[in-house]
Amino acid sequence: MNKIILFTITLLLQGGLCFGQKPVSVSSKAAGEKFEHFWSKSVGAGRANEGLRAGWLEQLEKVQQNCGFEYVRFHGIFHDDMFPIFEKDGKYTYNWQYIDDLFDRMLDLNVRPFVELAFFPTPLAAENSKTQFWWKANITPDESKYDEWYNLVQAFTQHCVDRYGIDEVLTWYFEVWNEPNLYYGFFDGTKSQYFELYKQSVLAVRSVDERLKVGGPSSSNFVADGRYDGEVESRDGDLITFTADNINDLEWKGSWIVDFLEYCEKEELPVDFISTHPYPTDYPFNPNTGKGKDFSRYVNSTKDDMEWLNEVIKNSAYPTAEIHLTEWNTSPNSRDAMHDFLPPAAYIAKVNLDCIGLANSLAFWTFTDIFEEKGGGESIFHGGFGMINYQGLVKPSYHAYRMLHQLGDEKIYHNDYLFVSRKSGDGKIVALAYNYPEDHYNAVPSSIKKIDQHKNGKSRSLDFNLSDLKSGTMFKIEVLDWESGNIYDYWEQMGKPEPPTREQIKVMKNYAENLDTDLVSADENGEVSFQRTLAPWSLVLIEQVN
């Protein structure tokens, strides 16, 4: 049966898509189920050198304070612009000044590095290495220099322990490379060469302390065909997906995950965590014509991918390995206009709440538009990944993470549009309502379709009653919708100033950060009702304040 139809029937049976929903009644004293805020464990950024900029650090401080992110992951810790290694007369010396500067500043902001061991510094790359991005990340391995790679990773790890202490570094994660399955993207080598690189890396890190956490393979999006089954990516394998009548009918699998686990078992190598990037998209090529297609999968695809991954790990030699999904967004395109709009906020809320318990982290890619894989943005809103733009204007995606962070740590109710939680420390209730319209379930929002199409969608009625409160208990209600917190439309109404003046930036920041709010209180019976229409893609945070 078509997954969309099956998914829709299930929700209809649960009452989840009945847009004249029955009232929901929840007792504030109801038994709660503990859960982890896996959405705030880690967040992504572009490359290490960008983290030395004042604006990047200011924005990191903001998302740490308001969204609770504990780790940040980025590319290029060993890239030439961090100057980690010098070669003279055939001898290597190491230089950690730039990395120290970055890590020191991050730790001062209470954010730890989720260390991605990449890319090759020029002295350790293959001669005439292929490069990625305008900043020329070296991606071609030279196996004759793997011993020197081992030495670099070992020296780097030892330096981190010496500088920050073993107790601190034991909390870090060391991930080997980024998306090595993308032969045309990030690793100009074979699957076997990556596996050997992982071996050298994990042995180097563990030589410093066997308790340090190392993982991989940091592979790209899930696929429904065999393009990554061989030693290098084969575009002949895309045809199944390219010609599918409905991509959501296909069976999707993680890239290189099974082979990686089998290799590590055979070589008796540690695997402390599995990492991969479950973007809900695919870009298959027709091998006969060379033409590509842009696909967005259905809304529940990320959950499907996580469930597949949990099953594979459970049946592997590493059943206790953590799961860190080190990149995720509505798409992996840093010029996808949808990233600046409202719909991703509802998607972020829905997916994270639906996937509680399925991963240790789901890292949004990225927290900032200070991000230069395709160079600087040509406009202040250019479809960048970031939840904050270059000028420091927060987007709806930022508010989604801020609202998720406000939730408690005990779940007391959850359906397809409402999550009610309690804070175990003080017993306060925090609820999040959201409307991901059912008429958009078949594809995650992206600019593959016109943006205007996503302004349409079914509204939803919220009729929610809380009981067993003290009389007078106050709740603050915050609304994120097309009229409140939707900074792109506000900028458009201002005439799209490019670049905006300093005064215009202040005005836009005030609008973007201050959502429409209201206050309600429990009656003399200790009850309070929340009744409103949820516009398509909107979020409503209901937070007890006393």
Predicted stretch roles:
Residues 4-14:
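Sec-dependent N-terminal signal peptides
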Residues 18-20:
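Boundary at the C-terminal end of the N-terminal hydrophobic targeting segment
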Residues 191-354, 358, 380:
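Noncatalytic carbohydrate-binding groove/subsite architecture in carbohydrate-active enzymes
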Residues 22-158, 165-171, 175-176, 181, ...:
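N-terminal substrate-binding region of glycoside hydrolase catalytic domains
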Residues 37-40, 67-72, 108-114, 169-173, ...:
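Loop/turn elements at helix/coil->beta-strand transitions in domains of secreted/extracellular proteins
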Residues 434-546:
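C-terminal beta-sandwich/jelly-roll accessory domains of carbohydrate-active enzymes
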Residues 324-450:
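Aromatic/acidic polysaccharide-binding cleft in carbohydrate-active enzymes
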Residues 42, 106, 156, 174, ...:
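Conserved, mostly hydrophobic/aromatic
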